[in-house]
UniProtKB/Swiss-Prot annotation:
Family to which the UniProt record says this protein belongs: Belongs to the NAD-dependent DNA ligase family. LigA subfamily.
HAMAP family the record matches: DNA_ligase_A
Name of this chain's protein: DNA ligase 1
Record gene name: ligA1
Catalytic reactions of this protein: NAD(+) + (deoxyribonucleotide)n-3'-hydroxyl + 5'-phospho-(deoxyribonucleotide)m = (deoxyribonucleotide)n+m + AMP + beta-nicotinamide D-nucleotide
Native species: Nitratidesulfovibrio vulgaris (strain DP4)
């Protein structure tokens, strides 16, 4: 007899963990685990939900594509859902996919359109009467981010379709990529001017398309490669193609580039031969790929097979195994994270893996070093797990010379010298000194990161400088900084310093309770749990007073999480931090986990505002967040009901329209002065 409560708890944990990794991968471009590790978790959840249907949840990652839409860009619904793909990692799994089609269709399709599985950013470009009108990222599949202005700068994207029989409306799906050679040149330019150096072409492509400043996007070597369509509206009402291979030919006629090496395969065996051929040649291709996508070629068969909640039943991604190369393990250094965990990091002789130079790889914990039998000076095999995260696979014992040395895990913290503690129920070694400089530094970095308050302009580099200089010892100290304070640090000129301070102020006045809970970095408390807590407690005072039993009655909170929350609030240093944050004005009081709280005494309370033009002190999204935090309602269209319009530089037709209606117009400085009233 199965233990349903136990399986229910496991399924809930898997859903939360998969959702967290989806956000890290799709939204933040900072994956923590490999594709293979993600797929192991995903398949476990699929198996649980299949064996016990009562565990099914419509919000489960198995029922959706993955990746919520970021707040910085406008959201828009897809006309037709943009699905993800199911994966296969072996010939047996490819055979099982074919067998499922045999069991579904009376006549089994034998032809498949195959092309490389590109490692870029999936999105949709939309054309009305042959003219490019808009672009959306895949987002969560149902809605995406509007990136029209950015995509207009992509040089190989046709702004007007060529050829004949152009549809009235055409939605083209594809991938934005950066070629390997272009990526190397981009990173060289970035490094030369002290800019961000990207980890891989996918991160560079995703970050470039999501830029609010399209002049930056225009300077990036982006390509759009089309692989399919969404909605198509034609004169005759019926598409003039009956196969996917015909569709690809039509897309090329209209002016789209397509993935390299695409071809029609006339049997499942030919598909597998193509997969093996492309796997052997992947290094010679101009773009990064991580597998092959095989699609049933016949469009009637595609319609008959249909879709699951997550993916088409007529297409499959055949993933390549991770590429492995040899290099030397030069050293192992131990880093201390914000929760005090000591993490060993392999220092490697630099080597190229899958087009990316790798010189470091996490070893996770002491047991991984022991289990793999690693010694300092070893020649090792290295791969990028899931073609993303560097990983030491194993030592090449046969190459040992006798000069290799064992690594001894430290018994004291490498940062503060405190004795290292290892709980019996954990694999991690921890520094439990709350005053440890590394713990403080990493906690502040997390506080302002995208996973915390998301303060633009306060990256790891500037936080490191502030902590090292003694200007900041806790997160609350950030809110005492001035523009002049920041201008003394590297990469902080007058404009960037002013923008960073404005971002801090926006975070202080606009943070939700849920966002602040995330920023505090309470162990085991992620975004979903933070939203749960913010829904059930009116503020941090109420949360602090809740005992373990009360916490256990909340959804998503088990004994381990409840104990971690109590441990955080029982720590005197944390209580002092909360009081300092309260004194700085960062104390959301509304139990709304999804929207900003409204501060009392605001001059903007109840007003309807519109922003137009380019703002200098902050981004448009930050201004919107600050206005809403002050109780205003921000809209995007000009109307007589507007109370005020905030006009930045180069304001255009909306400003003209507002003036013709006699609306009250203010500039960015006046808007900032209205916000200052919040602190009086």
């Amino acid at each position: 007899m199965c233990n349903i409560p136990q399986h229910q708890s496991r399924a809930a944990w898997l859903r939360a963990e998969l959702a967290r990794h989806n956000r890290l991968y799709y939204e933040l471009d900072t994956p923590e685990i490999s594709d293979a590790e993600y797929d192991t978790l995903y398949r476990e959840l699929v198996n649980l939900e299949t064996l016990w249907p009562a565990l099914m949840d419509e919000a489960s990652p198995t029922q959706r594509v993955g990746g919520e839409v970021l707040d910085r860009l406008e959201k828009q619904a897809h006309t037709m859902r943009m699905y993800s793909l199911d994966n296969a990692f072996s010939r047996d799994e490819w055979g099982a996919f074919i067998q499922r089609m045999y069991n579904t269709l009376p006549e089994t399709p034998s032809s498949f359109w195959c092309d490389p599985k590109m490692d870029g950013l999936a999105l949709e470009v939309i054309y009305e009467n042959g003219v490019f009108t808009s672009a959306l990222t895949r987002g969560n599949g149902a809605e995406g981010e509007v990136v029209t202005a950015a995509m207009r700068t992509v040089r190989n994207l046709p702004l007007r379709l060529r050829g004949n029989n152009v549809p009235h409306r055409l939605e083209v799906r594809g991938e934005v990529v950066i070629a390997k050679a272009d990526f190397e040149q981009l990173n060289a330019r970035q490094s030369a001017v002290g800019g961000k150096v990207f980890a891989n072409p996918r991160n560079a492509a995703a970050g470039s398309v999501r830029q609010l400043d399209t002049s930056i996007t225009a300077g990036r070597p982006l390509q759009f490669l089309a692989y399919g369509v969404g909605q198509v509206v034609l004169d005759g009402g019926t598409a003039p193609w009956t196969t996917h291979s015909d569709l690809m030919a039509r897309l090329r006629e209209w002016g789209f580039d397509s993935p390299p090496e695409g071809r029609l395969c006339t049997s499942p065996d030919e598909v597998w031969a193509y997969y093996e051929m492309l796997g052997a040649r992947r290094e010679s291709l101009a773009i990064e790929i991580d597998g092959v996508v095989a699609k049933v070629d016949d469009t009637e068969a595609q319609e008959a097979l249909g879709f699951t909640a997550r993916a088409p039943r007529w297409a499959l991604a055949l993933k390549f195994p991770a590429m492995q190369v040899r290099t030397r393990l030069q050293d192992i250094r131990v880093q201390v994270g914000r929760t005090g965990v000591l993490t060993p990091v392999a220092i490697l002789e630099p080597v190229r893996v899958g087009g990316v130079e790798v010189s470091r790889a996490t070893l996770h914990n002491a047991y991984e070093i022991e289990d793999k039998g690693l010694m300092l000076g070893d020649m090792v095999l290295v791969q990028r797990a899931g073609d993303v995260i560097p990983e030491v696979v194993r030592p090449l014992v046969e190459d040992r010379t006798g000069g290799e040395r064992p690594f001894v895990f430290p018994t004291t913290c490498p940062e503060c010298g405190s004795v290292v503690h290892k709980p019996n129920d954990e694999v991690a070694h921890r520094c439990i000194n709350v005053s440890c400089p590394a713990v403080r530094r990493q906690s502040i970095i997390h506080f302002v990161s995208k996973a915390g308050l998301d303060v633009r302009g306060f990256g790891e580099h500037i936080v490191q400088q502030l902590v090292d200089a003694g200007r900041v010892t806790t997160a609350a100290d950030l809110f005492s900084l001035t523009t002049v304070d920041l201008m003394g640090f590297e990469r902080m000129g007058p404009t960037s310093a002013a923008n960073a301070i404005a971002s801090l102020d926006a975070a202080r006045t606009g943070a939700t309770l849920a966002r602040l809970i995330c920023a505090l970095g309470i162990r085991h408390v992620g975004e979903q749990t933070a939203r749960t807590l913010a829904t059930h407690f009116v503020d941090l005072d109420a949360m602090r007073k809740a005992d373990g039993e009360k916490l256990l009655h909340l959804p998503d909170i088990g004994p381990e999480v409840a104990a971690s929350i109590r441990c955080f609030f029982d720590n005197q240093s944390n209580i002092e931090l909360l009081e300092q944050l309260r004194d700085k004005g960062l104390w959301p009081r509304k139990p709304d986990a999804n929207g900003p709280f409204v501060r009392e005494g605001s001059q903007l309370q109840g007003l309807k505002l519109l922003f137009t033009g380019s703002l200098q002190r902050m981004s448009r999204s930050e201004a919107k967040r600050m206005a809403e935090a002050a109780g205003a309602h921000v809209v995007s269209n000009v109307s007589k009901s507007l109370d005020m319009i905030v006009a930045g530089a180069d304001a255009g037709s909306k400003l003209d329209q507002a003036k013709s209606l006699g609306l009250h117009v203010i500039d960015e400085d006046a808007f900032a002065n209205l916000l200052k009233g919040l602190d009086r």
